[in-house]
Curated annotation (Swiss-Prot):
<dbReference type="Pfam" id="PF03484">
    <property type="entry name" value="B5"/>
</dbReference>
<dbReference type="GO" id="GO:0009328">
    <property type="term" value="C:phenylalanine-tRNA ligase complex"/>
</dbReference>
<protein>
    <recommendedName>
        <fullName>Phenylalanine--tRNA ligase beta subunit</fullName>
        <ecNumber>6.1.1.20</ecNumber>
    </recommendedName>
</protein>
<dbReference type="InterPro" id="IPR022918">
    <property type="entry name" value="Phe_tRNA_ligase_beta2_arc"/>
</dbReference>
<keyword id="KW-0648">Protein biosynthesis</keyword>
<keyword id="KW-0479">Metal-binding</keyword>
<dbReference type="InterPro" id="IPR005147">
    <property type="entry name" value="tRNA_synthase_B5-dom"/>
</dbReference>
<dbReference type="GO" id="GO:0000287">
    <property type="term" value="F:magnesium ion binding"/>
</dbReference>
<keyword id="KW-0547">Nucleotide-binding</keyword>
<feature type="binding site">
    <location>
        <position position="329"/>
    </location>
    <ligand>
        <name>Mg(2+)</name>
    </ligand>
</feature>
<dbReference type="GO" id="GO:0006432">
    <property type="term" value="P:phenylalanyl-tRNA aminoacylation"/>
</dbReference>
<dbReference type="InterPro" id="IPR005146">
    <property type="entry name" value="B3/B4_tRNA-bd"/>
</dbReference>
<keyword id="KW-0030">Aminoacyl-tRNA synthetase</keyword>
<feature type="domain" description="B5">
    <location>
        <begin position="266"/>
        <end position="342"/>
    </location>
</feature>
<dbReference type="GO" id="GO:0003723">
    <property type="term" value="F:RNA binding"/>
</dbReference>
<keyword id="KW-0963">Cytoplasm</keyword>
<dbReference type="InterPro" id="IPR045864">
    <property type="entry name" value="aa-tRNA-synth_II/BPL/LPL"/>
</dbReference>
Amino acid sequence: MPVVSLPYKYLERLCGIDRKTIIDHLPMIGSDIERILEDQVDVEFFPSRVDLYSTEGVARAMRGFLELETGEEVYPVSPSSITFSVDENLKEVRPYIGSAVIRDIQLDNEAIISLMGVQEALHWVVGRGRAKVAIGVHDLDKVTPPFRYYGAPVTRSFIPLDYDREMTLTEIMEEHPKGRDYSHIVKDKPVMPLIEDANGNVLSFPPIINGELTRVTESSKNLLLDVTGTDERAVMTALRVLCTTLITAGGRCESVTVNGVVMPDLSPALRNINVTSCNKLLGTSFSADEIATILKKMRYGAEKSGDSTVSIRIPCYRADIMHEWDVYEDVAIGAGFGNLEAELPATFATGCEHPIIALASAIRDICSGLGYLEVMPFTLSNEDVMYTRMQREPDPKALHVLHPISEEQTLVRTDLLPLLLDLLRMNKRRELPQRIFHTGDVVSSMQTYQKLALASTHPGADFSEAYATTDALMRELGISYLPAESADPAFIPGRAVDIMVDGKKMGVFGEIHPGVLNKFDIDQPVIGIEIDLHLLFPGQKETKS
């Protein structure tokens, strides 16, 4: 999770309260305090609460929680004549763009630092390191609308941020620090995404760098926002968070028309919640009026619409609200967890460590001793990573997400090795060798199982290394096994082995197939090992999902 730095003076000014009160209540709105310094406090929030990754967002939540200002904050959007055109040649490159104008904003140094902070946090949390979403903020008064978002040749040149000379797009990708960091996102594309104004001035080369021409300073009064990406929902989420942050900072929002679509849409989402369901989940006895009052503290619009129903308006920046239970969680936060009465269970029982968990703990120690680093990949994945890239048939018993928030999170993982390969892809420019492992849950047929996966990449990675690692692991665990030739299409034929224990297949190891490596865009050889831990304890029941 990114660490958010909250300067006391700016936060006190926005909240209207002293720093001690702020620090005392920060944990109550969901933050972990990392450091308390002389001029600022550094905090962490869950990645789902992207609206809290700015001083303005924290101040908005704090004012509500302390009942200094309750209910929804209204975000008016005035019409403007500013337009964006998007060229067709970006359809397979970076097709989506969101935009808005912020006028009459007063930016001091602290506000600019906060703006840069939320921009980078959104790049990390929503944008997946700018691959999915990238944000540009520009001084509108230095350019002339209408604007054009198009695919340009690599020979196009402009002066990038922090430089005083023109550079071609190729030079920027090779020489500019941001180019070296992010060029891998677009360098293999047929054209480069570029934003320019009516006079041909370049505003931005997303997702890499803005132009020096539109640098934002304390004298900037009118801002143009651009959010580009490969996922439309993520683009609009980032745009809404950015717009509401700047409105809270004192700006005034105007619309931009992008290929005929007027944006941003900052209107709230409407929903009814059931009072009985909320109380049952939380173990409370709140009335509809009490729940409405609590939700107003959490910056919802809320009114009682019946004895058992509350009508709510969900703020546009709350991209994390996907189910009624998300709202119920806010009821618990707003009421204060300390005010919820704890109850002892009616029955008493003693617990013990599950054998598979004990095995997983021992495996972590063994893998670390073998020189492998433990990683924690996401539980949610998608068909492309799980099956298509691995050259495997889809699992018909996989658990799919009914309403996925993005194309990258459409099912619960059924294997671990594909996720390790995806991590190696993301770190392929890091120093070699890379040896990683993970032991954790997978889900199939509504059952939760424990698996182990290891992966190693370097120029000399081969079958002998995979065999030696597996043999050492099984020997340390005291498990006898027999190797049998594997037909797993994720591995090179003749260089992969099934792990057989008591006549049953418990796993597989070998050299990853070049076709798989190509699909993951990995340049070096990789060996992989995957073991079903639950099969080592056939008498143990799996966990119901």
